[in-house]
Every structure is written in C-alpha cells, then in structure tokens.
Curated annotation (Swiss-Prot):
Organism, scientific name: Synechococcus sp. (strain JA-3-3Ab) (Cyanobacteria bacterium Yellowstone A-Prime)
Pfam families the record matches: Ribosomal_L3
Highest taxon of the lineage: Bacteria
GO molecular-function term, one example from the UniProt record: rRNA binding
Stored Gene3D superfamilies: 3.30.160.810, Translation factors
Function as written in the Swiss-Prot or TrEMBL entry: One of the primary rRNA binding proteins, it binds directly near the 3'-end of the 23S rRNA, where it nucleates assembly of the 50S subunit.
Electron transport keyword on record: no
InterPro entries cross-referenced by the UniProt entry: Ribosomal_uL3, Ribosomal_uL3_bac/org-type, Ribosomal_uL3_CS, Transl_B-barrel_sf
Region (Disordered) residue spans: 129-155
Family: Belongs to the universal ribosomal protein uL3 family.
This protein's name: Large ribosomal subunit protein uL3
C-alpha cells in the first residue's frame, strides 16, 4: 500500500507523442497536500496517513474540523481530508507536504471520484436494456419487460435493475497511464478520462493489483 494524493479535475485535451499520435489526456491539478494525521497499528489498529487539501475560508469548516487541524499543528485551513493506507507511517511527519513528485511518468494510477449525476434515467439509458418493437401495434417500446414470476415468489427481488437515479456515485477507474508530471504547476497529465465534472475532487493512488496475477 502506497500513499496517494488529492486533486481536482481541470479538463480534457490532447497531446502528441514523438511518433505523431494524438493521445487524449485529462489534466489534473494535484496537491500540494498536507499530512494532517498519522495512524499506526499501536494507536488505531491499522497504518494510515490522512492528507488535507484545498485551502478554504474558516466559515466552510466546523469547529471540530478546525480543532482537528490545530491539533496536528497545521496552520492553513484545508477543506478536504482523505485517508490513505500505508505500510510505513513512520516515514511521514505532521505538516509534511505531499506533491506530484511522488509519481513518475509511465506509472499506472487508480483514479477515484464522484461520477457525473444524470438525474432520473430509464432502463435503456441507465442499464442499456434493448427496446421493444416500435411499430406493428406494439405498445412495449421502452418498458422493462418482466420483473419476476407470479404468485411465487409474489414479489420483486431486491437488486433488480430498474429506472432510477443515475450517476452521482463513487467510481474508480483503474490502471490509467500517467503521461507527464509538471511539478512547477502541480499538474498530472493522465491518459484517458477520469470520473466526475471539471473541478471535481479526485483521489489518485498507484495502481493496485486486484485478483490473482496470471
């Protein structure tokens, strides 16, 4: 487990490789983040480092949040706090700055954020159901079809895919390639798209191995 960083999505653009290939990329303004808490196996039962990001006004923080930052000796007011599991928490100190220099070009990243909310959506848009016939007297155009059996079980099973609120949930896109790092402007240039709207908060971590290696 390795430390990540917090950032905000700036937008998408494209860059060109030395071979002349156009690469779609997302620009992320990441960090600098401040270490606001260090958790160890002895004190909390697990090892983790909490990072604070995005300076803000005092009115946007509760008294508990301001007290938490003051206890850590952090003078600036930070709006977003996130925790990252690490193997060696003793390698970090309270108030330490974490920048984009912890990453290197070519590295694979996992990027998590809140997906764009689409509001109430139907079966086709939300779950990609096929539609019914559009002519010959059909009245089943965009309906879901059967939602279960009859008297037995006499109910609709939980988890059945139906119309409802789409988007606005936490999404992680795995193994995105880091193309460039700009330490002077705190920018990460990531190949492909990342979740969320422009300006949305992102959690960026080194890619994790999920499942068994083949």
């Amino acid at each position: 487990m390795a430390l990540g960083i917090l950032g905000r999505k700036v937008g998408m653009t494209q860059i060109f490789s030395p071979e002349g290939l156009a690469i779609p990329v997302t620009v992320v303004q990441a960090g600098p983040c401040t270490v606001t808490q260090i958790k160890t196996q002895a004190t909390d039962g697990y090892n983790a480092v909490q990072l604070g990001y995005w300076p803000t006004a005092e009115k946007h923080l509760t008294r508990a949040q301001r007290g938490h930052l003051s206890k850590a000796g952090v003078t600036e007011l930070l709006r977003h706090l996130r925790e990252f599991r690490v193997d060696q928490p003793e390698a970090y100190q309270l108030g330490q700055k974490i920048t984009v220099e912890i990453f290197s070009p070519g590295q694979l990243l996992d990027v998590a954020g809140t997906s764009i909310g689409r509001g109430f959506a139907g079966y086709q848009k939300r779950h990609h159901f096929g539609r019914g016939p559009m002519s010959h007297g059909s009245k089943n155009h965009r309906r879901p079809g059967s939602v279960g059996a009859g008297t037995t079980p006499g109910r609709v099973f939980p988890g059945l895919r139906m119309a409802g609120r789409m988007g606005g949930c936490r999404v992680t896109i795995r193994k995105l390639q880091l193309v460039q790092v700009d330490p002077e402007r705190n920018l990460l240039i990531i190949k492909g798209s990342v979740p969320g709207v422009e300006g949305g908060l992102l959690e960026i971590t080194p890619a994790k191995q999920v499942g068994n290696k083949r």
